[in-house]
Regions:
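PAPS/PAP-binding and catalytic site of the sulfotransferase fold
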Residues: 1, 114-115
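Structural motif
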Residues: 202-205
Length: 227
């Protein structure tokens, strides 16, 4: 860490290598009527050249109410009250994460459907022009309101310094998001979403969830007991 008064930027955090191979962990909550579900992997850093395309991808996949994963798990299958995905952009590579809470008996099915959506947006059902247009609009429509207060402006300036971004990053946000093409969304989905290497963490009842996960073809879960 730089000494006090030293205005040199702090060194970037060490890059964490991606984990190869899918893994499942169940944190024991015996008798739980619901499971807390997280599925994720390493994503991208804030300065990544694909930042804007990844925002659009996330909006299509799980970043808004009408996104694919929420429509599947909530609207079609009624497994949950809501499901969402996020890319957590940091100085180093932050996580990509799906999060939701589902009924215990449908936990494995919810995991299965989530992975199907990951695979579909990569290959069999890439983002459509209509989905991409809606995603771009959701990201840009209210963007000017992010700078209405002094606190918001200070926070924005802090981001420029923290992530070492160009001074015109926020001015360029809307045009760069609007320039994201359907093909770019497919490209970044194939590049940054790697379902075979994703980690699944479930907080729930292992007696119900573990055999159901294995019946769906997932690897045998690691059972984690928290005192």
């Amino acid at each position: 860490m730089p000494a006090a008064g030293d205005d040199r930027p702090a060194p970037l955090p060490a890059d964490v290598p991606s984990v190869a191979g899918s893994r499942v962990a169940i944190v024991v909550r015996s008798g739980a009527p619901q499971s807390e579900l997280r599925i994720g992997q390493l994503g991208a850093d804030r300065k990544n050249a694909d930042y804007h395309a990844l925002l659009v991808l996330n909006a299509v996949l799980g970043g808004q109410f009408v996104s694919r994963i929420n429509m599947n798990l909530r609207e079609q299958r009624v497994y949950t009250y809501g499901a969402r995905t996020t890319f957590d952009f940091r100085r180093g590579r932050g996580p990509f994460l799906l999060q939701t809470s589902v009924q215990t008996q449908v936990t494995a099915a919810a995991v299965r459907e989530s992975f199907r959506e990951f695979e579909a947006i990569r290959e069999s059902r890439p983002a459509t022009a209509e989905e991409v247009e809606l995603a771009r609009a959701s990201l840009t429509r209210g963007f000017p309101r992010s700078f209405e207060t002094s606190e918001q402006v200070v926070r924005a300036v802090a981001q420029l310094a923290l992530y070492d971004l160009p001074d015109d990053s926020f001015e360029q946000f809307v045009p760069r998001v609007n320039a994201v093409a359907d093909s770019e969304v497919t490209r970044v989905a194939r590049t940054y979403l790697q379902p075979p290497d994703m980690i699944t963490v479930i907080v729930g009842d292992p007696d119900v969830v573990s055999p159901a996960m294995q019946a769906e073809g997932f690897p045998e879960p690691q059972i984690v007991t928290v005192e």
